[in-house]
A protein has these predicted regions:
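A boundary/linker detector
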Residues: 1-237
Length: 237
């Protein structure tokens, strides 16, 4: 199985002792989070992503790592120092630095991830914006089903189901249109979010009303007229 671990960058770099969070489990103390990140760095199957937040912890930018290109000078230098079969050091720590590229327009630049493992190539992370108010529709899908990146960004913006009081991880939920696609709703971050199968069915009940507000909040109105609001995830910062 896989574990989705979210850790503040300051904790990973040893600049602060702020807790992380394991999806579906809960908070992780900073020392364990740092150890888990170091262990993940030693596993070549680990997938790395970087999320930029605002001052409140809400996600405003995101990107996932890819190997540095073969023409990258830093990668060539790294490959030239490969240490053969020696095991990686147990205390190796991953680190991020700002890359040379600016990334896509309106984004947050390109970052370089070094895992701290001798001989391991660097990874490149290009961070694109998670548009909020207004939405730029850059990842809008032309049909009913979202693309992989749109689905992923929705799961970053909302780490859990947006149903009131639901805690199911977004990776185990459906991408659901708040304004139905058949009624002209866009397949876009401004009109879709993760809903578990139960809340997906509740939302489709004709006596329930669900609206996504410009700031990303989701307003649920019950048949009795009561209203409940869920907000985009606030990450530890």
């Amino acid at each position: 199985g896989r574990l989705n671990l979210t850790v503040p960058l300051a904790t990973v770099l040893g600049l602060a002792d702020r807790p992380g969070e394991a999806a579906g489990i809960g908070p992780v103390d900073p020392w364990l989070a740092r150890d888990l990140a170091a262990a993940a760095a030693r596993n070549p199957k680990t997938t790395w992503c970087l999320t930029i937040t605002d001052q409140h912890g809400r996600p405003i930018g995101h990107g996932c790592a890819r190997p540095a290109p073969a023409t990258d000078p830093a990668k060539r230098a790294t490959l030239g120092t490969r240490a053969g079969p020696d095991p990686p050091p147990a205390d190796a720590q991953p680190g991020f630095t700002i890359g040379r590229e600016h990334g896509p327009p309106g984004g947050y630049g390109t970052w370089r991830l070094t895992t701290g493992i001798p001989g391991a190539p660097d990874l490149i992370v290009t961070v694109e914006p998670i548009s909020t108010d207004p939405c730029d529709h850059r990842r809008e899908a032309p049909g009913h089903d979202p693309g992989l990146m749109l689905r992923h960004l929705a799961q970053i913006r909302y780490a859990i189901c947006t149903g009131p009081a639901c805690r199911r991880p977004a990776a185990q939920a459906d991408f659901e249109h708040n304004t139905p696609y058949e009624a002209g709703g866009r397949t876009c971050l401004c009109n879709g979010d993760p809903k578990c199968r139960h809340d997906h069915r509740v939302k489709q009940h004709p006596r329930w009303q669900v609206d996504q507000l410009p700031d990303g909040s989701v307003l649920w109105t019950t048949p009795a007229g009561r209203q409940y609001t869920t907000e985009p995830t606030r990450y530890p910062i």
